[in-house]
UniProtKB/Swiss-Prot annotation:
GO terms for molecular function: electron transporter, transferring electrons within cytochrome b6/f complex of photosystem II activity; electron transporter, transferring electrons within the cyclic electron transport pathway of photosynthesis activity; oxidoreductase activity. Its main location: plastid. This is Cytochrome b6-f complex subunit 4. It is a multi-pass membrane protein.
């Protein structure tokens, strides 16, 4: 750890610079009014113009009309619900499935209390949290991929 030199506030040159506003609290130009009144509205209006331009030039197609009498064979949720859908689909008891879904965020909330870490550290110095993260990621990917397959191949991912 290096030795830091504290500024001498009795130095007349330093006092003159601080009096002119050249101290630690003066960095570049102020945000008001330059950024907030001139730059931000241009960026916001430019973003809105790009979105409107893309919507006008390349509109998304509406698709086929809905038919309430023709239901697809299997209804799948959005991709980020695939692991939860797979848990509910494979567990025979509904209460157990709901408890398993509740246990995931509960388990994630307990991870910081498992290790005695007061500040951010290298992941290699936090083996429990790193292991929980890696296993959780692998299980979420496994469940997510399995949710897209038929029920008889979902647990083995069709490999066995």
């Amino acid at each position: 750890m290096g030795v830091t030199k504290k500024p001498d506030l009795n130095d007349p040159v330093l006092r003159a610079k601080l009096a002119k506003g050249m101290g630690h609290n003066y960095y570049g130009e102020p945000a008001w009014p330059n950024d907030l009144l001139y730059i931000f509205p241009v960026v916001i209006l430019g973003t809105i113009a790009c979105n409107v331009g893309l919507a006008v030039l390349e509109p998304s197609m509406i698709g086929e009309p809905a038919d309430p009498f023709a239901t697809p064979l299997e209804i799948l949720p959005e991709w980020y619900f695939f692991p939860v859908f797979q848990i509910l689909r494979t567990v025979p008891n509904k209460l157990l499935g709901v408890l398993l879904m509740v246990s995931v965020p509960t388990g994630l909330l307990t991870v910081p209390f498992l290790e005695n870490v007061n500040k951010f550290q290298n992941p290699f110095r936090r083996p429990v949290a790193t292991t929980v993260f890696l296993i959780g990621t692998a299980v979420a990917l496994w469940l997510g991929i399995g949710a897209t397959l038929p029920i008889d191949k979902s647990l083995t991912l069709g490999l066995f």
